[in-house]
Amino acid sequence: MDDYKYQDNYGGYAPSDGYYRGNESNPEEDAQSDVTEGHDEEDEIYEGEYQGIPHPDDVKAKQAKMAPSRMDSLRGQTDLMAERLEDEEQLAHQYETIMDECGHGRFQWILFFVLGLALMADGVEVFVVSFALPSAEKDMCLSSSKKGMLGMIVYLGMMAGAFILGGLADKLGRKRVLSMSLAVNASFASLSSFVQGYGAFLFCRLISGIGIGGALPIVFAYFSEFLSREKRGEHLSWLGIFWMTGGLYASAMAWSIIPHYGWGFSMGTNYHFHSWRVFVIVCALPCTVSMVALKFMPESPRFLLEMGKHDEAWMILKQVHDTNMRAKGTPEKVFTVSNIKTPKQMDEFIEIQSSTGTWYQRWLVRFKTIFKQVWDNALYCVMGPYRMNTLILAVVWFAMAFSYYGLTVWFPDMIRYFQDEEYKSKMKVFFGEHVYGATINFTMENQIHQHGKLVNDKFTRMYFKHVLFEDTFFDECYFEDVTSTDTYFKNCTIESTIFYNTDLYEHKFINCRFINSTFLEQKEGCHMDLEQDNDFLIYLVSFLGSLSVLPGNIISALLMDRIGRLKMIGGSMLISAVCCFFLFFGNSESAMIGWQCLFCGTSIAAWNALDVITVELYPTNQRATAFGILNGLCKFGAILGNTIFASFVGITKVVPILLAAASLVGGGLIALRLPETREQVLM
């Protein structure tokens, strides 16, 4: 009995060396009952049969059958991992050879434009709310805090989408999850143009942001797996042009659609579909077109091989090869690959079958299984062998996002500040004026009236814009059909005066004294001061800022594979930091626009190199997950940068400039600690 140390689950014994031997008998089987002695085994009826207890012979047979699988499970995770890593390394080099045979041609260019539209939709999403807000705030009566939440909710959604959908793409497939991502964005972006309430609009933009948040990580992971090493850096950089195109598209559409107030309709008094809603729908078109076109593209063969789907991957690679060869005029060339290495599969997906559970139980098990796989994959990126690369990349991504998005919001805010200061410098001040029996039916704008006296005056069908009445006496005056913006009465005495059909609400009268005055049928609707005109200069600024990255995109694409990813990141971030100091000389609108274009043009190379090196540093089964984590952190940096930089507008330029420069210098230097991936095959 020394060789048998423990009892198994079936009442038998297992050897002490940890392996089952099917030809060894259980020692207890030698002991026979006196009751059954002398009976034929064929005639014997096992008494436990009626109680559902398995016969010892059945147990023995089952143990013998299960022995090989138990032996496999006892080999340990370490051996399986080592074997899988060896398989993945062999596959990486073989796949590189296969992509060289497939060539770079028509297939990659078709996929380039399809995925480019998805990336364009990501660029549009960043701008659409900020462009629509000046008009939407009137329809929804938005306060400053609500407008701020709308601006932030898009980034929150994109941050969540990057985390979730990036992880799913490594488990369910690039094409499948990207299609889901685009469908969610297109649906809720379009729906947001029809909803009337602030809460519903906020919710739609949040879900829309979650949908498009997964586009960037998946697009770069997806496209990289159809590129050979020699083409990867350059063509991933070319793909970045579509993000710039998204900004141009949004700016151009806002400029051409939103000012046309007649481009809409009304249904009754409560439902209004104005031109800004048309703009929101138009901005969903790139996403919709990309979603439809993606239906005709195949799944990534590299992902399929990672999942052990050899035949399906082979068919797609043959399709890539044949498409490119036909386009080059050599259709007779045969795809010579017959067998491709597939990594050993470590975990099998298990779910309850229809005969053993209800539909919601099966979906619950499926959800839990996928969630655990995605979570474990994410933990592996930040705690496994890639943790140092992930940490360095996280710092660089955050530094870039904090400075870039912070300054791109700060630039328009500073331009508005310069406009406001110039506007205030032209303000007219009237002191001690006396007006009797006048009829005023024109626009009064940018004026201050102090210590005046207005008697028996009539204000009718007029517009007050940025007007202040201070310490003024109104006697027997009549206000009819008056509209106002940023107009206030301060320390005034108002006697025997009638206000009929005006929007001069109670909060516009500050410390005023009323004597026998009456308010009749005040205007309904929003009681807040809202600008009547859209600032077209802001559209122009965004358009020029997006256009300015084109030279940087071209240069980075041409040099990416020549000078390497690290020099591109470090050089671009350090040059951008130097450009920040020129902002001290930005004391006018035109100067600020010029420095913005310079900053955007120099920083885009770092963004492109970051996209490329992030794709190349991680293996196929972690590529989209890691990209999603880093891109989600990027959106968090954008939120933080927007909030901090905007708080210093009109106070000081020193803090935003120093913060941006320090962030860029620090990120650029830390990036140099990353490994160069220019000559690396895609694992």
UniProtKB/Swiss-Prot annotation:
The modification Phosphothreonine is found at T36. It is found in: Cytoplasmic vesicle, Secretory vesicle, Synaptic vesicle membrane; Cytoplasmic vesicle, Secretory vesicle, Acrosome. One of its GO terms (biological process) is regulation of synaptic vesicle exocytosis. N-glycosylated. The N-terminal cytoplasmic domain is phosphorylated by CK1. GO terms for molecular function: transmembrane transporter activity. Gene3D superfamilies: E3 ubiquitin-protein ligase SopA, MFS general substrate transporter like domains. Residues 1-108, 170-182, 227-237, 299-390, 557-565, 614-626, 673-683 are cytoplasmic. Glycans are attached at N441, N491, N516. The modification Phosphotyrosine is found at Y423. Residues 130-148, 204-205, 259-277, 412-535, 587-592, 650-653 are extracellular. Pfam families: LD_SV2, MFS_1, Sugar_tr. Residues 1-42 are annotated as: Disordered. It is a multi-pass membrane protein. PROSITE patterns: MFS. Keywords: Cytoplasmic vesicle, Glycoprotein, Membrane, Neurotransmitter transport, Phosphoprotein, Synapse, Transmembrane, Transmembrane helix, Transport. One of its GO terms (cellular component) is plasma membrane. Coiled coil: none annotated. The modification Phosphoserine is found at S33. Probably plays a role in the control of regulated secretion in neural and endocrine cells. NCBIfam families: synapt_SV2. Belongs to the major facilitator superfamily. Interacts with SYT1 in a calcium-independent manner. Forms a complex with SYT1, syntaxin-1 and SNAP25. This is Synaptic vesicle glycoprotein 2B. It comes from Homo sapiens.
